[in-house]
Amino acid sequence: MAVGKNKRLSKGKKGIKKRVVDPFSRKDWYDIKAPSFFEVKNVGKTLVNRTAGLKNANDALKGRIVEVSLADLQKDEEHSFRKVKLRVDDVQGKACLTTFNGMSMTSDKLRSLVRKWQTTIEADQTIKTTDGYVCRIFVIGFTRRRYNQIKKTTYAQSSQIRAIRQKMFQVIQNQATGCSMRELVQKLIPEIIGREIEKATGGIFPLQNVFVRKVKILKSPKLDAQKLLEQHGEAQDVGTKVIKDVAPLASV
């Protein structure tokens, strides 16, 4: 007879059930606030465990990165191919104050731009803003037919590609250098950099569908609570003028 474990004898007591604890009972919801240079301030909500012992809920929230569609932030479906990254830098009450942490294009939009019979030209430039951010801007563009062109293909020569890339470097440097992160984002949203590149490269080879493909934050400045509040419009140097209603004089 084989010696082994008898499963029938090793069963525990009947009727005793393990206590089930709802994990959401120990969590709280926090609001995610976008900077004031976006039209929509309330991005959404995030979940975190409550403060217990040495584990602080605020520390768990700081550093979280959320990805939001620019169409939702600007209330405009034309920006639906843009994705914006926001990083939680501070927590005040139940509000998570975020800063801009990068931008990219959706893969379906990028794939729809790549076609036959044209040349794809890409460039990237590292710039530094006046408020201490170091970011790398990636640009992409495509050649198009000249006016009254009969030839089907629009391939650019190597010398033309190099010249166009140099123009891209110059435009990115001129548009991004000397401005703050707020001003840079306000240039990225309406595609100012892409339009300027199309104008600058028109004499070399006409381009179409020139976009800022990606913005990558390489280095962020040290957290300044005052500047963060200014980005969210919660601390302003100049207040709004208050006009009080003057009560009419009583008749004699």
UniProtKB/Swiss-Prot annotation:
- Please provide, alphabetically and separated by semicolons, the GO molecular function terms listed in this UniProt record: structural constituent of ribosome
Q: Would the keyword Acetylation turn up in this protein's UniProt record? A: yes
Per the record, the GO terms for biological process are:
translation
Q: Which InterPro entries match?
A: Ribosomal_eS1, Ribosomal_eS1_CS, Ribosomal_eS1_euk
Membrane: present as a keyword of the record? Answer: no
Coiled-coil residues are none
Its localization reads: Cytoplasm
Task: Write out the GO cellular component annotations.
Answer: cytosol; cytosolic small ribosomal subunit
Q: List the Pfam families hit by this protein, alphabetically.
A: Ribosomal_S3Ae
PTM N-acetylalanine: at which residues? 2
Q: Which UniProt keywords apply?
A: Acetylation, Cytoplasm, Ribonucleoprotein, Ribosomal protein
Could you give the subunit structure recorded for this chain? Component of the small ribosomal subunit. Mature ribosomes consist of a small (40S) and a large (60S) subunit. The 40S subunit contains about 33 different proteins and 1 molecule of RNA (18S). The 60S subunit contains about 49 different proteins and 3 molecules of RNA (25S, 5.8S and 5S).
Which PANTHER family would you find in this protein's record?
A: 40S RIBOSOMAL PROTEIN S3A (PTHR11830)
Family per record: Belongs to the eukaryotic ribosomal protein eS1 family.
Its name, as the record gives it, is Small ribosomal subunit protein eS1
* Species the sequence originates in: Schizosaccharomyces japonicus (strain yFS275 / FY16936)
The gene it comes from is: rps1
